[in-house]
Amino acid sequence: MEIPNALPERGAAPAGPVAPAQVQPIVVALIGLPGAGKSVVARALADQLGLRRVCRDTIRHAMFPVCSYSFAEKRAAFRAVMLALEINCLLGESTVIDGVTFSRRRDLVRVDSVIRHYGFTPIPIYLDCPPGVAHGRIASEIEHNQHVARDRTPDLVYEVQARFDTPPPNALVVNANQPAADVCRIVVDAVAGIRRGSPANDAPQGGVA
């Protein structure tokens, strides 16, 4: 994802003490294996920075309550995510995209094609999680019935890993093999800094690869 020059945010109330003139409108794309912790981080960004969370899993469940998790159903839900993203851009609202692994670089290109006309800054963040750790997390989720996507199995981790494109060179890489609270803090601090106009390489470095 290429980071374009950002325009001042239109219509969105800033989160926390940041003045409106200092805030860039942003779109965060969380990249990572199933079980990397994308949803936990997305919720933290929504709660702490006021980003609108657009989740493909939630949208797919609403569109197809009885779902076979086919390619067609997943792509329909992804199209709906892109539509929701564009509406948020029209409203001047920053977004975090959840429920998408972005294992294929072309999906990040789709995000760019939606937001480039609105002057939003794309922030790709790769949650780097060892497959074995992600596998164990999903197994625990299944045991406790904690995820809406019923096709989400431990073996899905290795299926996605096999087709995972290398994240874009400008992605912020965060070590996701650490406590969720630490991962969330690192990402929230980094995104808050970029949103204020700080260069990505000035973001907090604790746990960032």
Sequence positions of predicted segments:
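Conserved substrate/cofactor phosphate-moiety recognition/catalytic segment
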Residues: A36, V40-L91
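Conserved nucleotide-binding/hydrolysis micro-motifs of P-loop NTPases
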Residues: T58-R60, F102-S103, D128-V133, P179-A180
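Small-molecule kinase domains that catalyze NTP-dependent phosphoryl transfer to phosphate-bearing small molecules
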Residues: E143-I186, I194-G197, N201-P204, V208
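Extreme N-terminal, non-catalytic leader segments
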Residues: M1-P25
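Conserved phosphate-donor/acceptor-positioning beta-strand/loop module used by diverse small-molecule
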Residues: Y118-I138
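Hydrophobic anchor at the beta1->P-loop junction of P-loop NTPases
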Residues: L30
